[in-house]
Amino acid sequence: MATLRVSSLLASSPSSLHCNPSVFTKCQSSPRWAFSFSVTPLCSRRSKRIVHCIAGDTLGLTRPNESDAPKISIGAKDTDVVQWQGDLLAIGATENDLARDDNSKFKNPLLQRLDSKLNGLLSAASSEEDFSGKSGQSINLRLPGGRITLVGLGSSASSPTSYHSLGEAAAAAAKSAQARNIAVSLASTDGLSAESKINSASAIATGVMLGIFEDNRFRSESKTPALESLDILGLGTGPEIESKIKYAEHVCAGVILGRELVNAPANIVTPGALAEEAKKIASTYSDVITVNILDAEQCKELKMGAYLGVAAAATENPPYFIHLCFKTNSRERKTKIALVGKGLTFDSGGYNLKTGAGSKIELMKNDMGGAAAVLGAAKALGEIKPRGVEVHFIVAACENMISGAGMRPGDIVTASNGKTIEVNNTDAEGRLTLADALIYACNQGVEKIIDLATLTGAIVTALGPSVAGAFTPSDGLAREVVVAAEASGEKLWRMPMEESYWESMKSGVADMINTGPRDGGAITGALFLKQFVDEKVQWLHLDIAGPVWSDEKKNATGYGVSTLVEWVLRNSL
């Protein structure tokens, strides 16, 4: 690979769970229970090593390759852009940075000096390509000694999303050129405070790390990106910026885990596989994280009838209830919180089977996107180790399948707080599993809860594929999460909790039904979950059905990990 020298460019099946369909429903006139459980041990052949290195047979004999997360040396440097040496230089420029003088020369000092070294090639190329610095624009210059990429940042680069996009564009150019050493710089840092520069460097690093990552575990042949080092130029140096970049690396590792969990098919990531991944996280960070995995029999003892009702039909892959706890040795504790993730490793819809092209049943492996975000956050926090906060990570993992033992439309299940639910739609199963998970979280004595779930298609209709819906009765918690999401560059929008809609969720024979009319479906879904949260606990529900998956890239996004980690840190000492 040639080295870019800006100053001289022109010179050179096992046992399983069986239970009767109406799990944990007790008729008032008949106190009899009828259960028959036979539970696969957690370390059975089907769930021995999870996601990163599966051992044992799976349906289709698929065995993924090792995870190939990027290993990049990242540093903040004060090297002059014009003097930097490497394979590819990416420069982020706003529309103002591209302004020209009367002689069609750049007014921006950095672009002016760079263009002078290149004998006007930069200005000529930007004119020829009609590059004006608009968001989404980019041009690539192939030069004898390497490449230069100009990336548009729009009218102003004032958000982490802009710098994240710059990093992603740099990563795309690096992959195309198979570059080993790249640098990223801003054309201008005018108006950026010292803190903003640090945050910008972190966002750029995040964009490069996530942009360079490719999930090739299920490809018979793949090309590993060549990128080895990233220099971030002109945004400062020193311990603070290096610490922020290291933080970004830890968060990206969590995001990549989240992506891999969602990308992996349901014949690889089963409920047992998620449980094993949780055990792996606890083992890796045993100084701060403990794990407790409950099997079906233990969940039965806790009267988790809503969760077990959903899981009843999955005779090949029994449910596992996952509870990780993060706690440092510090005696000081600011707050105690819980992160709850929906963990449906596959959702067929049950007897209300998903049918037709619009059902996207082939993508129902992503119905555990909430669980993936929670486990990704656990991994990141295990590395970061914030002080003074206790975090409970909770996932009720199971499959929603069809069998003679399965839950039927019209069945009534009883949650662990005693509330009864008439199941009028077996495809509204996630909220049933979350009901028992939220009750369990409240029983841990937490003060705040965030749950994440691919809960409704209605939220995608309302907000589109890129924005999550946030539901909470707490204005204070809403502000906390919105600020954390903005700092992380993830998009969410607070939605109303219209209490009058609850009337449509009332049952004639039980306390409630599990799904209401089509209109306002995302709201009634959130109102349903609210029935299982203690009134004294602050709670926020994130419906991530849209941003969990990118149709354009045909890949998981890892949505939620960054926001969760940022929110936890803001609740720490």
From Swiss-Prot:
Binds 2 Mn(2+) ions per subunit. The keyword Transport does not apply. Induction: By abscisic acid (ABA), jasmonic acid (JA) and wounding. Mn(2+) 2 binds at residues 347, 427, 429. One of its GO terms (biological process) is proteolysis. It comes from the Eukaryota. Its EC number is 3.4.11.1, 3.4.11.5. Residues 1-53 form a transit peptide. Coiled coil: none annotated. Its cofactor is Mn(2+). Keywords: Aminopeptidase, Chloroplast, Hydrolase, Manganese, Metal-binding, Plastid, Protease, Stress response, Transit peptide. CDD domains: Peptidase_M17. In tubers and floral buds of untreated plants. After abscisic acid (ABA) treatment or mechanical wounding is mostly accumulated in leaves, to a lesser extent in stems, but not in roots. Mn(2+) 1 binds at residues 342, 347, 367, 429. GO terms for cellular component: chloroplast; cytoplasm. It is an enzyme of class 3 (hydrolase). The active site is at residues 354, 431. InterPro entries: Leucine_aapep/pepB (IPR011356), Macro_dom-like (IPR043472), Peptidase_M17_C (IPR000819), Peptidase_M17_leu_NH2_pept (IPR023042), Peptidase_M17_N (IPR008283). One of its GO terms (molecular function) is manganese ion binding. It is found in: Plastid, Chloroplast. Its main location: plastid. Presumably involved in the processing and regular turnover of intracellular proteins. Homohexamer (dimer of homotrimers). This is Leucine aminopeptidase, chloroplastic. The gene is LAP.
